[in-house]
UniProtKB/Swiss-Prot annotation:
Domain of life per record: Bacteria
UniProt-listed PROSITE patterns: RIBOSOMAL_L3 (PS00474)
GO molecular function terms listed in the Swiss-Prot or TrEMBL record: rRNA binding; structural constituent of ribosome
Free-text function comment from the UniProt entry: One of the primary rRNA binding proteins, it binds directly near the 3'-end of the 23S rRNA, where it nucleates assembly of the 50S subunit. Strongly stimulates 23S rRNA precursor processing by mini-ribonuclease 3 (MrnC); 20-30% DMSO can replace L3, suggesting the protein may alter rRNA conformation.
Name of the featured protein: Large ribosomal subunit protein uL3
Biological process, per Gene Ontology: positive regulation of rRNA processing; rRNA processing; translation
Lineage start: Bacteria, Bacillati, Bacillota, Bacilli, Bacillales
Coiled coil among keywords: no
Species the sequence originates in: Bacillus subtilis (strain 168)
GO cellular component labels: cytosolic large ribosomal subunit
């Protein structure tokens, strides 16, 4: 069954394995999440649990939000997200979900929102090849052909310049190197999407090796 937790990306560092190998890791702070709601097939059409992470001031939340979290006897949360495919009987409303649900060596999928890069050209945004840079060439870094003349339009999906980044990305099959239960930290091998302090979702790998 799937298990997951919401956290915040702290940054990257490196640790040494027992054999002396240097391992680059991303540090994710996953303070205890609270189960705000259990969604059932009878009431909602699907099964899921709703997790809340990172308390926020009541002054910044509205009445429906306060009433919703009151059922779980907790404070309003800054980040709320649903997890499907979990073992529903293992969770109760108001229960805390901590980093101890994971252990070192587990393979997980990590979801976050990539860093925004602003308006970028087709070469940086899509990895296209540039034209000759030598004297006489009139084609360097432009997008190139827009397609055939006859349709009198540009087809959807044409790779063009535009806003880059700021998209939800999932990196699959990352290994948990260490779980620090005292400080609510997960050390995950490699890099994960998102800027520092951004929201990260860590879930059991869908395509685990």
């Amino acid at each position: 069954m799937t298990k997951g937790i919401l956290g915040r990306k702290i940054g990257m560092t490196q640790v040494f394995a027992e054999n002396g190998d240097l391992i680059p890791v991303t540090v994710i702070e996953a303070a205890p999440n609270v189960v705000l709601q259990k969604k059932t097939a009878e009431n909602d059409g699907y099964e899921a649990i709703q997790l809340g992470f990172d308390d926020k001031r009541e002054k910044l939340s509205n009445k429906p939000e306060k009433g919703h979290v009151a059922k779980a006897e907790t404070a309003p949360k800054r980040f709320v997200k649903e997890l499907r495919g979990v073992e529903m009987d293992a969770y109760e409303v108001g229960q805390e979900v901590k980093v101890e649900i994971f252990s070192a060596g587990e393979i997980v999928d990590v979801t976050g929102v990539s860093k925004g890069k602003g308006f970028q050209g087709a070469i940086k945004r899509h990895g296209q090849s540039r034209g000759p840079m030598s004297h006489g060439s009139r084609y360097h870094r432009r997008p190139g052909s827009m397609g055939p003349v006859d349709p009198n339009r540009v087809f959807k999906g044409k790779l063009l310049p535009g806003r880059m980044g700021g998209e939800q990305i999932t990196v699959q099959n990352l290994e948990i190197v260490k779980v620090d239960a005292e400080r609510n930290l997960l050390l995950i091998k490699g890099n994960v999407p998102g800027a520092k302090k951004s929201l990260i979702t860590v879930k059991s790998a869908v395509k685990s090796k």
